[in-house]
């Protein structure tokens, strides 16, 4: 994830101090990794054993919700073999061998397994349906202890902002989103899945009490006891869309439904998080979501040997990017932050921001120019990225303690676009995911000369609506 890396300077301590402050580093409490010493491997399966698989594309109601099936039907999209669950016989053979399955992806035909010693892999010898194995995670010795912050009452007693939208007014205005709101399109009937690492105090912050919550799910191994006690990043992302406190802070899609999914492990950076993301996307699809907001991105990991390379940015090499590229074919608009590496050595967008048929979102400042940190394109196969831009330097957000602050990052640009996509799609219900993506791009203020810094520019969502309405 695009984390804020904090340099920790520790001094040499005496042996007594080390003993007295066991498991502390530079004032931070350290604890053993909650999953214990373990490793995870991704197993690629050769097929779906169609001769014995009890599921059929002709009976999608057995593995997809009615809402998901209706979304495909509305857009003229078929149920295909990637939608079929994994072969039950293959899963059973793995578990019968004494191997724990902790994740799976039907779109990619993969399993995620957890073991505690490398020699356990020998148990899989002879299972000829496994075509490839890849190590995607090795547990660290310790991680920083996480604490849930309290909601401070005084931080939730805000003064009135500038008009109905309060502190969130400018970021909506920049996209000409008020016109859609004034025509009574605030995202009603659309479901947005929010992928993040936690949603601290979403269940307690007054401005978020009226959120239309469709559900919560956790795919990180090990799972959290409560995603509302995890990191606040997801809270800030969600607030830009869902908050509904008139005259204080109103988000861009206050009438949409929200499915909150934890698929980012803030304690570590590993390829396993791509497996979590894939599981999250498939779960969101099965629930019938219309839009995914993913303010997440990857390229460097704790194990540098597994780092991604620029030549892989083709929308299909990385598992996470291949998964994101499939969303539009399922009828889902995937919106992903570009990344914050514009000033670093990497500079490029992250994964899955390189995916095809998604909206990759960069950041602008208050003057309307691109933020220096906003990652750039193109993709390795020459596609323009980012696709569009939105406020991100700064964006006004609500923190996990309930305060309104300005914060920087493409993480907060992405949900502004995702929320407005919900409003646009509500207004144009007969459009497909790919048509909506095209309308948003063409409504950008740089659409005549798109480039790899500003993309198609900042979308005018009223213009997108007018254009879409004129096209039958």
Question: Where do the protein language model's features map onto the residues?
Answer:
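Substrate-binding/access-modulating region of protease and related hydrolase catalytic domains
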Residues: 244-247, 260-354, 380-383, 400-414, ...
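Subtilisin-like serine protease catalytic core
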Residues: 34-36, 132, 168, 178-217, ...
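Hydrolase catalytic cores
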Residues: 238-241, 261-265, 348, 388, ...
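Bacterial Sec-dependent N-terminal signal peptides
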Residues: 1-25
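Catalytic-core environment of secreted peptidases
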Residues: 203-214, 363-412, 448
């Amino acid at each position: 994830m695009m984390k804020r890396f904090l340099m920790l300077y520790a001094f040499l301590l005496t042996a007594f101090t080390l003993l007295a402050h066991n498991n502390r580093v530079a004032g931070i409490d350290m604890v053993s990794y909650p999953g214990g010493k373990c490793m995870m491997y991704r197993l690629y399966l050769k097929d779906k054993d169609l001769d014995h698989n009890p599921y059929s594309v002709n009976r999608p109601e057995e593995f997809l919700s009615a809402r998901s099936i209706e979304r495909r039907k509305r857009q003229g999209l078929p149920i295909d073999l990637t939608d079929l669950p994994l072969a039950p016989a293959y899963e059973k053979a793995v578990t019968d061998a004494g191997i724990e399955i902790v994740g799976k992806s039907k779109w990619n035909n993969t399993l995620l397994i957890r073991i505690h010693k490398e020699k356990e892999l020998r148990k899989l010898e002879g299972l000829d349906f496994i075509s490839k194995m890849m190590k995607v995670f090795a547990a660290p010795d310790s991680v920083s202890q996480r604490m849930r912050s309290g909601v401070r009452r005084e931080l939730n007693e805000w003064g009135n902002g500038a008009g109905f939208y309060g502190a969130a007014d400018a970021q909506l205005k920049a996209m000409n989103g008020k016109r859609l709101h004034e025509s009574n399109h605030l995202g009603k009937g659309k479901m947005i899945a929010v992928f993040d690492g936690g949603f601290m105090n979403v269940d307690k912050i007054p401005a978020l009490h009226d959120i239309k919550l469709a559900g919560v799910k956790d795919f990180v191994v090990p799972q959290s006891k409560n995603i509302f006690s995890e990191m606040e990043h997801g809270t800030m992302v969600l607030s830009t869309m869902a908050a509904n406190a008139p005259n204080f802070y109103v988000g861009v899609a206050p009438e949409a439904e929200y499915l909150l999914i934890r698929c980012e492990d803030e304690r570590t950076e590993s390829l396993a998080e791509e497996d979590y993301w894939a599981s999250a996307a498939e779960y969101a699809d099965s629930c019938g979501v219309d839009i995914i907001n993913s303010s997440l991105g990857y390229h460097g990991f704790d194990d540098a040997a597994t780092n991604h390379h620029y030549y892989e940015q083709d929308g299909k090499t990385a598992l996470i990017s291949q998964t994101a590229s499939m969303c539009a074919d399922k009828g889902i608009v995937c919106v992903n932050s570009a990344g914050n590496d514009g000033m670093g050595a990497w500079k490029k967008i992250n994964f899955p921001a390189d995916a095809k048929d998604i909206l990759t979102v960069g950041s602008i400042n208050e003057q309307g120019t691109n933020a220096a940190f906003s990652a750039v394109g193109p993709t390795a196969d020459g596609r323009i990225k980012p696709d569009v831009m939105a406020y991100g330097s700064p964006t006004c957000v609500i923190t996990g303690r309930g305060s309104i602050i300005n914060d920087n990052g493409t993480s907060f640009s992405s949900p502004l676009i995702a929320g407005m996509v919900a409003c646009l799609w509500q207004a144009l219900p007969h459009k497909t995911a790919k048509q909506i993506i095209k309308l948003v791009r063409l409504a950008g203020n740089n659409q005549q000369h798109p480039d790899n810094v500003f993309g198609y520019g900042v979308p005018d969502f009223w213009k997108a609506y007018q254009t879409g309405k004129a096209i039958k």
